[in-house]
């Protein structure tokens, strides 16, 4: 069991690292394309899309590239927002997959229907149903390490949970809504707008815009990047599970 849980947590951390490897490449490539396209059209204002593509992108069959739009019509803020949405959506997906693996592994005696409910709650940033089900599991050294009792409660975890809820609600507006902040987003923002990095135990607090229901969703890429630290911390906080069966120094060195 411990090996399976370790694998789930390690995989999530590795996936986050791989995501950044690609996201930074996309960000840098988009910026370089934008700069090169601006220069090209300044020197060749009447060039068509095919000519621009052949000049700007060599050795790659990219169909439908509208370099003029990248250079002159779309703002860098728009393009960066788009990358931020991709990063946020993928990051939430990593955490959701981790939740599925952990719940299925730890809650051996819970029904499938209960597990489904617990997964839904955890993915919303709500831990109560998980804690309740965990308390019903037969006691073991492993379960004892995992249970977040008042004595073992990390002082930052509730604030981290609230930050997660805010960004999850923003992601929902992008993935399932009309790209407008909802009342839920506004409420989640108000719950964390005065928090600091010290309140959350992180090196930097995620940057956010003032969030009001009905306003267009706006994400700050740097804020989404820092949010990934929250995802990682939320994962690492649960590594207490593994201490009974794995060397803690090994786990820390891997992460």
Could you tell me what each predicted segment is?
Residues 160-189:
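Histidine-centered, metal-coordinating catalytic motifs and their short helical/loop contexts
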Residues 3, 145, 170-174, 185, ...:
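Generic recognition of cysteine residues
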Residues 112-119, 171-174:
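Internal hydrophobic scaffold segments of catalytic domains
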Residues 1-116, 150-162, 186-255:
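Extended intrinsically disordered or low-complexity regions, especially N/C-terminal cytosolic tails and loops
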Residues 119-169:
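A contiguous pocket-lining binding segment that forms or flanks enzyme active sites
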